[in-house]
Amino acid sequence: MPILEGAGVTKHFGGLAAVSHVDFSVDDGQVVGLIGPNGAGKTTLFNLISGALVPKEGAIRFRGQEITGLKPHRICRMGVARTFQSVQVFANLPVLDNVLLGSLFGTRNGMSAEDAAGEATRLLEFVGLSAVRATPAKDLTLANQKRLEVARALATRPELLLLDELMAGLNPTEVAQAMALVARIRDQGIAVFVIEHVMKAIMSICDRIMVLHHGQKIAEGTPHEIATSRTVVEVYLGE
């Protein structure tokens, strides 16, 4: 059953259709990939889902309830969390405090400070950052800053997590660790919608993949179907 659905979602910037009449869905417990060349509209679609942008046309529903045009904080508290293409952490705050902010803000609004601290500590262990809990976020490696963003997003207690290029800029070992983290998140019962350019990763972790090109959905299917799609190959290789 879909946890997230979009119908005819459209967003223009001036005369440019960044996202054009796109339908999409993410089912409970699924990892769904979103791929496409740079400028295809992937991050714009995430911004529309999360409330950072408002569609010109179309509707977006979460758990059957329309969220089109709601403010980001309302969508977050309904159970949708995200990370960002460019890492956004509170640079001068310790790692633990970054996650605490998510715990205090999320779906269980009103959590006590003691419970929030316990939840933040658990999540740092979950993503592998327990050893650097007192380190300022600005002093982390890129890979660990990305893990911190994931932990902070998870601290809001989401049912759906949007991951925007979690693996960009990582070395092969870090990519493998990130793939394992996504699998663990799915095993926690959280649906994941992931933008990624690391094709080996996207083909390995996703149940289904959607392809955008010039703001339009041009293909959707299993990893095997996408990997063997002539349309997708032409978009990526220019044949």
What spans do the regions from the language model cover?
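Glycine-rich phosphate-binding loops of nucleotide-dependent enzymes
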Residues: M1-E239
